[in-house]
C-alpha cells in the first residue's frame, strides 16, 4: 500500500480473534478462537491494545495461515505483526513452514513481537536440531522485512545467535505491557489461610510427568476455596460438553476431567476472553502453577503469582521479567501454596518494569511501529470500548441439568442443525445442477432422510450425553 498523509496505517495482527469480537461459549469453542490455548489471547489482546494509536488501526488475521492471501495482504495492509509464543518447537514446525511461505510473498514489513524456543529446563536445544532449517528460513525471511526479531528471553536469543543471527532482541512478551510502563502487584494478606481464594493452573504434561497432580490434590484438601483455571480447548470441551475427541482428555488426574473431585465440586473455570479472565482474578489472593500466561493473567490483575517452570519457555520469561518462580523438578510434591506465597518477592518485577517497557517500545520504534502509551491515549479508548461489551462468563463444569444450564447448549445445537441442513440443501442443489439426480440422502427436509448427514456432522461438536439425545430413532 502507498502511504497517504490523511490515512491511518493498517496493521494486520496474527491473533485468534479481535478483542472486540464477542461470541457465545459454544461459538468460541466451535471456532477455537484461542488456537487450542486461551493464553494466546492474553498476548494477542495486549499487542492489539499496544499497537492501536491515532495513526494506526489494527485488524485480526486469525491464527490459521493462508499463503494464498499474500497479495490481498500486500494491497490492504501496511505491516504484518506476529506475536508468537513457543513457536520454535517440533510440534509447531508445519505451521511455522506455512507462515514462512506467506511471509516470502509479502512486500510489507513483518515484525515478530516476541517468539520463544521450547526445550528442557537445562536449556538443552538438541531436540530442536532437526527443525533448524525451518527456523533458519523463517527468521531469515522475517529479518528481510524488519530491523530485528523480538524474542522472549535469554535461551531463545542464544539459540538464534548460535545459528548465526545477530539482529535478535530480547523483549519478553507483549502481555506484560498491557498496562504500559507501570506494574502493580500487592499481597492483600500477610499469609494465606484456609479462607484464602487461590487459583491454580497447569498443563496435562506437568500433571502427568512432573507430579503437579499431587501438588493440586493436597492444595485442594487444604484450601476449600482453591479453583483450577484451565486454558486448553480440550479442557473447555470437557467442562462444557463433558467430552472431547482429543485422547489427552482421558487423563483423569486433571481437574478438568469430569471424574476429578474439583470438577464434581464445580471448582474449575476456563475463560475465552482475557478481559473476563483478568477481572475474575482480581478477587483472588494468590495464583500458582505451570501455566505462564495463566499466572501472567493474575499478575495483570494485581494478584501475587508464582510459576512452577517445567521447560525453557516459561523459565526464560520468568527470569527476564523477574516473575517469582521455581523449577517444578525442584519443587516438593507436598508444597503448601502458603510457602510459595510467603517466598514470592516482586521487587525485581516491579522495579525493573519501566526499563523493560522502554526496551520493548524501543524495539517497536526501530521496526516502524508506534505504541498507544507513547503515541496515543495509553489505551483509554481501547479499554472504554471493551467496557461497553458483554462477554460470556467462564466455562464451568457441566454438573447440573436444570433448564437454564441446558437452554444455551440446545439453542446453539438447534442453530447448528439449521446451518447444516441449509448447507446440505445447497450441496444437493449444486449436485443436481452438475450431474443430475443423485440417490444419496444428504438433503435437508422433514423426516428421517434428513437425519444421517446432519446427525453425523452435529455429533462432532457435542458431547456423548448430548449426542444420545440427538440420535434419531431407529
Give the location of each predicted region.
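Active-site anion-handling motifs in enzyme catalytic cores
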Residues: 1-470
